[in-house]
C-alpha cells in the first residue's frame, strides 16, 4: 500500500506554516501555532483520528488569530487531499455525532472535491 503522507509549506504576508501529515500514523501530534486552545484541538484531532500531525505555524497573532487559524485549515485540507491520492477504497461522504467531554460534536464530511 502506498504511504499516505503529505508535507505542506505555506508562506503569506501574515503567516508561515509547515505541516506534515501521516494518515496511517498512531495519533502523535506535535503542534505549535502560538494559539494554545487551537494547538490543543489539533492535538486531539490527531490523537482520535490516529494520524500523525506536525504543525509549526507563526502568524500575526498580535493582530488577530484568524489568519493563522484560516491558513492552518487551508494547509490541513491540502495535506489530507494530497495524502489520500486517488481516494481508492475511500467512502466519499460520512457523518457522525460524538459526545466528548462536555460537548456534542456533529460532523459531516464529503471528500468528492466538488466546490460547495
Model-found features: residue ranges?
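Structural preference for solvent-exposed beta-strand-turn elements
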Residues: 1-116
Amino acid at each position: 500500500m502506498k504511504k499516505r503522507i503529505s508535507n505542506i509549506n505555506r508562506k503569506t504576508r501574515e503567516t508561515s506554516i509547515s505541516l506534515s501529515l501521516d494518515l496511517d500514523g498512531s495519533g502523535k501530534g506535535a503542534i505549535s501555532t502560538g494559539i494554545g486552545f487551537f494547538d490543543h484541538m489539533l492535538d486531539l484531532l490527531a490523537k482520535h483520528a490516529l494520524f500523525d500531525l506536525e504543525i509549526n505555524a507563526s502568524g500575526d497573532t498580535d493582530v488577530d488569530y484568524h489568519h493563522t487559524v484560516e491558513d492552518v485549515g487551508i494547509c490541513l485540507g491540502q495535506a489530507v487531499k494530497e495524502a489520500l491520492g486517488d481516494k481508492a477504497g475511500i467512502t466519499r461522504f460520512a457523518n457522525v455525532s460524538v459526545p466528548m467531554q462536555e460537548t456534542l460534536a456533529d460532523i459531516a464530511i464529503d471528500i468528492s472535491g466538488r466546490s460547495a
